[in-house]
Amino acid sequence: MYEKEVEQLQNIIDDSKRIVFFGGAGVSTESNIPDFRSADGLYQQKYKYSPEQIVSHSFFVRNPEGFYEFYKEKMMFLDAKPNAAHLKLAELEEAGKLTAVITQNIDGLHQAAGSKNVLELHG
């Protein structure tokens, strides 16, 4: 169905020397990690405080138990494994094609797949 597009992308990768990947939630949702903003994402769930408040420094100082409970329940996915996208990006880095991964994901799956130059930027 997308053979032509995949072939075009492969040609671009083959001809490139310094690729930077910009990614977000779509990469990790394939590893069963929920995103933040979809209809059933983290920001749509019901809590006494918003996720932004709960993960803030001031909330942590005032309520460390609540912070850790939320973090453990909603931010840690110990069973998640890198998927094909994570693995392919690590392979491209190892081959010297990929210079950096810039991601909004804070799940560590790019690093678990073997990528070394990962910038996690969320917020």
Regions found by a protein language model. Give the residues of each.
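Conserved catalytic core of sirtuin-type NAD+-dependent deacylases
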Residues: M1-G123
